[in-house]
């Protein structure tokens, strides 16, 4: 059957026809469902925030915000415990920043290659491979870093510091290894989101640029990428979130020791500190670990 608006309907199929009362009832029910879903999301965020505040606030009151944030010594189980997280916070900031510096250019150029340069057959192979990277568990990246990157970093460390008796060798588990692994892990996110943004740029903009005499490379960097800027920024933000929130892969390659975040030092990130100590901590120690969540 076809109604006056041209929409086909069956005896038991969907139809836009119906009484005003039934339509109003359906609208009301759907509005309630949407509202409940939205409230649930807000409640979840609020519950997490309240839990962190209640659990970590006692440590902030006992230790002090200034002492915790600017003290560099983390020895929660010592006879005179110290709960300084300055090096841990600094490591997370520096590690994430360098991972973004390494990963974003590679990811963006890869997205440009798939979207603008590669032949359709090549893109049909590369794009699924990138999407497959996004589905690989974090622990796999960590194991690959432990088996491949750490030994290479150790060889580099030996070559640089072989005549330095004061250097504490890390076996390759250092900040550089962690940054490389993080940079690799954010690639799928940056590539996929950037690719989607580039594909959303109207073809007419590219054609107009080429018609004015611009080369393909000039069109890519002067027209296409600027037009997709908002989506690329979103890709970077998501990459930052992925990098700063990663734990399991980094705990395998970073050495997980609280040190100044220098390239060849074993370091600890906020997330790896939480993973490492939450299981056995108690009392003020546990509360201080929960305070690391505030920084995140």
Label the predicted regions.
Residues 1-38:
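Transmembrane alpha-helical segments of polytopic membrane transport and secretion proteins
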Residues 100, 113, 168-211, 215-218, ...:
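Membrane-cytosol interface at the C-terminal ends of specific transmembrane alpha-helices
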Residues 106-145:
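Cytoplasmic-entry segments and transmembrane alpha-helices of multi-pass inner-membrane transporters
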Residues 43, 49-82, 257-264:
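Short membrane-interfacial helix/loop motifs at transmembrane-helix boundaries
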Residues 132, 136, 193-194, 216-251:
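Transmembrane alpha-helices
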Residues 250-295:
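Interhelical loop and adjacent transmembrane-helix boundary motif
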Residues 62-86, 142-184, 254:
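Membrane-interfacial helix termini and adjacent extracytoplasmic/periplasmic loops
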Residues 85-113, 296:
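Transmembrane alpha-helix signature in integral membrane proteins
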């Amino acid at each position: 059957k076809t109604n006056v608006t041209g929409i086909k309907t069956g005896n038991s199929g969907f139809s836009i026809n119906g009484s005003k009362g039934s339509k109003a009832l359906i609208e009301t029910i759907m509005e309630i469902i949407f509202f409940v879903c939205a409230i649930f999301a807000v409640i979840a965020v609020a519950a997490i925030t309240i839990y962190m505040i209640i659990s970590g606030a006692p440590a902030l009151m006992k230790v002090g915000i200034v002492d915790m944030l600017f003290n560099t010594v983390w020895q929660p189980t010592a006879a005179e415990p110290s709960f300084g997280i300055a090096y841990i916070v600094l490591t997370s900031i520096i590690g994430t920043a360098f991972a973004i510096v390494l990963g974003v250019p590679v990811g963006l150029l890869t997205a440009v290659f798939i979207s603008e340069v590669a032949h359709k057959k090549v893109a049909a192979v590369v794009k699924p491979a990138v999407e497959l990277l996004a589905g690989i568990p974090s622990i796999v990246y960590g194991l690959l870093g432990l088996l491949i990157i750490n030994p290479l970093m150790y060889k580099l460390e030996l070559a640089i510091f072989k005549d330095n008796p004061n250097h504490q060798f890390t076996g390759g588990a250092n900040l550089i290894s962690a940054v490389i692994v993080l940079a690799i892990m954010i690639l799928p996110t940056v590539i996929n989101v950037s690719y989607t943004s580039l594909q959303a740029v109207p073809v007419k903009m590219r054609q107009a640029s080429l018609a004015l005499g611009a080369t393909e490379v000039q069109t890519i960097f002067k027209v296409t990428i600027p037009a997709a800027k908002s989506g690329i920024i979103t890709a970077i933000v998501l990459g930052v979130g992925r990098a700063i929130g990663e734990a399991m892969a980094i705990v395998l390659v970073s050495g997980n020791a609280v040190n100044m975040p220098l390239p060849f030092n074993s370091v600890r990130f906020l997330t790896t500190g939480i993973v490492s100590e939450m299981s056995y901590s108690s009392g003020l120690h546990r509360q201080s670990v929960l305070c690391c969540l505030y920084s995140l």
